[in-house]
């Protein structure tokens, strides 16, 4: 029988917990990013091939993963600079014109909405049940290549944003999981003590270790990384690389979000 926790709030991870990604969607977003960057760079008089941009984007993956593992953040513009510098062999091509930079940034983040991850099929019902039982509901997300404002818009489009009392995105607060302070920020925004919160996520380091360091209860959503993500240098596979080598233990494990209700009073 599952242990039951007396909590007043539940927080969710975004990627591979609330929203599910696929290698096909991930590749499509990367294609759209490179196409958009190439088109906008051409308008600025910078000739760079799609292939060189794609190589730059691939090279950025381990760089980003190493930074994010430490809970640090890289802005959209910094990511673009890295990719373009690699693609152009470090020629300084990004101008300071705000409108031009805004167009470059939009071409980079907009694929999060044009080729979006899919809402977990169990999420709407579970969120509704939590709301009916007066639990506070929060989201704690490491944003990756898609910024918080884009992911929040995706939640709105899928009809789940209004269930949340707080949505915390790492690019907006300036730090990410597994840092303790992003979980403490969530608790403060929900008006609860960390000990009153159950955090649900798929990453043993980012979600379980991080939430436990703040004093939260944890459920590990046991979602297997699709083989396609392991066959290419994806951020998902790289951030999960240490999961099998950890001594961290969650308070419970689930294979479906609907199981959350079995753990809370």
What positions do the PLM features span?
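N-terminal helical cap/lid subdomain that shapes the substrate entry/recognition surface
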Residues: 4-128, 132-133, 148
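Asp-based, Mg2+/Mn2+-dependent phosphohydrolase catalytic module
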Residues: 1-10, 14, 20, 27, ...
